[in-house]
Curated annotation (Swiss-Prot):
The gene is rsmG. This is Ribosomal RNA small subunit methyltransferase G. The keyword rRNA processing applies. GO terms for cellular component: cytosol. Keywords: Cytoplasm, Methyltransferase, rRNA processing, S-adenosyl-L-methionine, Transferase. It comes from Polaromonas sp. (strain JS666 / ATCC BAA-500).
Length: 226
């Protein structure tokens, strides 16, 4: 058994997340790749492998079951497009690409070396559904079904900057620590929060949640359909 594999498999079991042996191997290879690149390019402040497992991999993996439920509920299990904003080392975008091969994942970052890392990860991990993009999210006009972020910006800035890239039926999926009451209160009236989902990250004694949001116009359309 590889280093970190036991902790990873225990975490997957706690999250009730079933992955193939190949996907487990890809996650471990991804962690190794982050470690190698960080020595040269300082991709992440977390360098200890054990800490990287809990604070990066398992933290990102905790978002996969909620994402899968959303895609299943909305009939987007095949062919959905997801944008990970301010992706950095690819968290959670690369993790999602590994766990959800049917989802086309684009990781965007304003730092060239981080976008280059995503492109290298796509090649090294053999992930045809993953792409890296060096750009400001405000310049993206391609439409996405899900736009996610992890430890990125305030909810107001996140939704404003990425708004032009959100499909009419699309949702924002913001990974946060504890429930961000002030940020929620600062959202514009055009954005609706339809769910705040608490997350339990194995081995991490800290609050985590996902704030699910959509445009008010999209919410009105769903209500009319109902």
């Amino acid at each position: 058994m590889r280093g970190g594999e036991q902790d990873l498999r225990a975490g997957l079991k706690a999250l009730q997340l079933e992955l193939t042996d190949s996907q487990v191997g890809q996650l471990l290879d991804y962690q190794d790749l982050i470690g190698k690149w960080t020595k040269v390019y300082n991709l992440t402040a977390v360098r200890d492998p054990v800490e990287m497992m809990t604070h990066h991999l398992l933290d990102s993996l905790a978002a996969v079951p909620p994402l899968r439920r959303h895609l299943r509920k909305t009939g987007q299990e095949q062919g959905a497009c997801l944008l990970d904003v301010g992706s950095g080392a690819g968290l959670p975008g690369v993790v999602i690409a590994i766990c959800c091969p049917e989802v086309a994942v684009t990781c965007v970052d304003t730092v060239a070396k981080k976008a280059a890392f995503i492109k290298q990860a796509a090649l090294a991990l053999k992930l045809p559904n993953l792409s890296g993009l060096h750009a400001r999210v405000e310049t993206i006009t391609t439409l996405f079904d899900v736009i996610c972020s992890r430890a990125f910006a305030s909810l107001a800035d996140f939704t404003q900057w990425s708004g032009d890239a959100l499909a009419s039926h699309g949702v924002w999926m913001a990974m946060k620590g504890k429930q961000p009451a002030e940020e929620l209160a600062s959202l514009p009236p055009t954005v609706e929060v339809f769910h705040v989902e608490q997350l339990q990250v194995p081995g991490l004694d800290a609050e985590r949640c996902i704030v699910w949001m959509r445009c008010k116009s999209a919410a009105a359309g769903l209500d009319q359909q109902g």
